Amino acid sequence: MSENDKSEKMKKEGIDYSKMGLMSGLEIHQQLDTGKLFCKCSGYLRQDEPDFVVKRKLHAVAGETGEIDSAVEHEAALDREFYYQGYNDSTCLIELDEEPPKQVNQEALDEAIKIALLTNCEIYQITQVMRKTVIDGSNTSGFQRTFLIGHDGYIETSFGKVGIDSVALEEDAARIVEKDDKKIVYRLDRLGIPLVEIGTAPDMDTPEKMKEAALKIGEILRACKVKRGIGTIRQDVNVSIKGHDRVEIKGFQDPRMMVETVDKEIVRQQKELEQGKKMGEVRNAKEDGSTEFMRPMP
């Protein structure tokens, strides 16, 4: 029986999510409608031909622990080349990782604080810019700058409260304009646009509760100075059932797809457990509700 058939069978019979030990959470990334986060560039996307292209490659090296991250090693083994397109009048040395970042954009910081307050978070009185490793070439620096704004918040749903673990402000990645097995071409116009990341607690025990939480957070974001349209918001789902490691599913544009996708992911994880597998990984959401492997979990 295929995953689709099993998912349909489970729908008809009623899924006992509690018995399965379903744990799920959301990560929502929303672009802010301000200038870029660490430079003075405007942050609008361009369709005209770029003025220049820079080529680079990823090299896997050991981190502070003395070990090479498995996800970095996986990407480096692909031996891909990364090309970065830029413009003479709207791309700066910071975006090329040839100059240190400037002071954080105050307008973006104010909007992030507003979102944290609207999700009932405690605001950090002191915060520090951190660096998250990025392995797919979408950040010229090899990492993403991010800092925490709020913590321990919540939103109300008809299923009860959903915890908000954190609200962070970070920089968006460059956007892909061309890709094949050995090459990815990025455009630098999106790199550095401010993103607010909202991470919920893993306390949603049904897909319907997750969908409602995503819609509620969307309402809050639309009350703030955010960009609108396709690609300006990205929603990721973290899912696990009893005995299986966490799986991150990326690429949701419509929260209504979450219910079907989570049901199919439950079937997939059940099948893996039957085969003696339980490893976490990162997967990409597809329009039919299925998912496909992207990379190992970092």
Listing of model-derived features with the role each one plays in the protein:
Residues 2-298:
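Basic, nucleic-acid-interacting segments
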